[in-house]
Each structure stands twice: as structure tokens, then as C-alpha cells.
Amino acid sequence: IYNNVQSNMCVDNNKANADNECAADTFAAIKENVYTFWHNYWSSGKFLYHENEELMRRVILSQYLLIVNDSGYIPPAETGLTCNSWYGKAHLEMHYWHMAWAALWGHPELLEKSFDWYISILPEAKKNAARNGYRGARWTKMVSYTGKDCPSKIAPLLIWQQPHIINMLQMVLDCYNNDVHFKKKTDRYMHKYWILVQETAEFMEDYLVYNIASDTFNIESPVIPVQERHLPEDTRNPVFE
């Protein structure tokens, strides 16, 4: 569940009790790693203290639930591990809501570990943009772990998730720049993830339509804005986007 457990699985067909020994070793390793993770998590980062006990209870509970449900190596499903709504798929406009807080609360490494997944599906995101006639990478809304766009009458026309990865990358970078313990990671970090910024921004630029008469760039139909309540063919320059 915690995606922090690294266990060495053992296989020994020559011993009758190999499976039992393997299970015991694996459980011991899992137990130790889980203990270490939670100890380090609650002993580091930032915290909010307030005399209101109910507020404190909610802060602590929220930090626990968000880490258990959302801090994996791939973005979480819409409702985490709790239930199976929205077909159990990851929704990239929700990744920001689920995990961006980790950078602000002193746990940037827990947010960063999901960025490799974006790199792994970058080819699919580029194919998605190309299918729509654009350059760069178009991140899907409802997505499989392989980066495939899941069937939906709404998801393909949503765009407000596009800048989220850039924003999250910047939030983690700010943490590294402002903390002497992390600062040595900055150059490696920028070199590794710049491709995500470049491809994401290229799509966002190409998506806009230039109007010669008004000398403006516009978001033209069809597009479904964040409210998901307006006809895509009648929507132009939605305010939030």
C-alpha cells in the first residue's frame, strides 16, 4: 500500500521449508520498512499547530489518508484506494488536488516519485496530441496506467489538467532550492524532468488559436470547461482555463 516497501523475494526449490522462510523474511522486511517510513514521515516535514483539537485531528487524519491513498508511483484513482468510483481510473486533473500539498508540507520526495510515471507515458501523450493535430504532449483526463486515454464523452475535451504537471514540478523544485538538504538535487532534477515542461508547454501553445483581427490568442470550441456543464461546441475561452 505504501509503495515504500522493498522486499527481496527468495526462491529455493531444494528446501521443503523455502516458502515459509521466504514469507517470514519478506514479512520482517515489510514490517521494518513500514515502521521506518511512518517514523520518518511523522518526524519530518511541516506541521500546523492550533489549539482547536478538531482542527488538529483533521490535519493529522488528512495527512495519513492522503499518504496511504495517493502517494504511489502512479497517480491515484479518483477516490484513492477507498472505493471504485469513476471506473477505478486515475484522473490527471485530480493528481494536483491529491498530492501537490506534499511539496508545501515538506515532503517533496513523495510527490516527485510519481513524476517518473509521466516520463514513462510521454510517448502516449505525444501520440494523443498528434491525433488531435497538435505538437507536444497532451495529457489525458481519465487515463490507464499505461497512458491510454480511457473511453469517455467528457475526458477527451477537458484541458484544465494540462499545466498541473508543470506546476507540481515547480513546487518540488522550489522545495529543493530552499532547503540545504535538497539543494544538491536541483541540477539532476531539472535535467531529468525538463522534457515534461517542454512537451507540455508546446501543446499548450499550439492549442491556442490566433485571431488576426483582435490580435489575441483564444481557446476555441470544442472544449469542455472545468464545470463539465456546458456544451463543448458552444464553449469558447472558458474563464478558469
Give the label of every model feature segment.
Residues 8, 67, 103, 202, ...:
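Residue-level marker of positions within ordered structural domains that often coincide
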Residues 77-89, 134-190, 205-241:
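The feature captures the catalytic groove of carbohydrate-active enzymes
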Residues 64-73, 110, 114-130, 196-212:
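Long, well-ordered core segments of solenoidal/helical folds
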